[in-house]
Regions:
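Non-transmembrane, membrane-proximal soluble domains of secreted or membrane proteins
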Residues: 1-169
């Protein structure tokens, strides 16, 4: 049963499709832009300050792509497909509140999929009066990935569809 669930990866056309590239010590989130198609990425274009994913903006679909560092934004109640990879060592992409956890392995592209059923705001309202009160939703690394492991922390924001569309614009 579990294998059927995990291996039932949604088609990119039927989901919000993102790429997450892990590295010591950051989560690089690649969004395809308004055309919904990813531009090419090339290792020779990687620049840790200006282009950590090596996005080729001159490629056919690359001009409107963008990326964030440690900031994952997704819509609520929509299938999310993340193509997960790593630039350096094994990391573990973990969204604790969504019960998502998957190793990111150098040289591999691993699809992960999930659907968030409440917005960040709705989820955090349920945390009032608990240890989670006043916190945010996080992206964690659940694999000891080096001396700076404590620094690989990101944030997850789950939006209503119209707010997500506005954020993308």
């Amino acid at each position: 049963i579990w294998a059927e669930r995990v291996n039932d990866v949604p088609d990119p056309r039927d989901s919000e499709h993102l790429r997450v590239v892990a590295q010591q010590y950051a989560w690089n989130i690649h969004y395809p832009g308004a055309d919904g198609k990813f531009g090419d990425v090339r290792v020779d274009l990687v620049d840790e300050q200006d282009n950590p994913i090596g996005l080729d903006r001159s490629s056919e679909f690359g001009a409107d792509d963008f990326y964030t560092i440690n900031q994952l934004h997704i819509p609520v109640n929509k299938k999310i497909r993340v193509d997960l990879s790593s630039k350096d060592v094994i990391h573990n992409f973990k969204l604790p509140e969504l019960r998502v956890s998957q190793d990111a392995i150098p040289g591999m592209n691993i699809p992960v999929h999930f659907t968030a059923t409440s917005t960040s705001e709705e989820f955090l309202e349920t945390a009032v009066g608990t240890k989670r009160e006043g916190k945010s939703l996080e992206i964690a690394c659940a694999q000891l990935c080096g001396l700076g492991h404590y620094r690989i922390k990101g944030y997850l924001t789950i939006h209503e569809e119209e707010d997500y569309t506005a954020w993308l614009a």
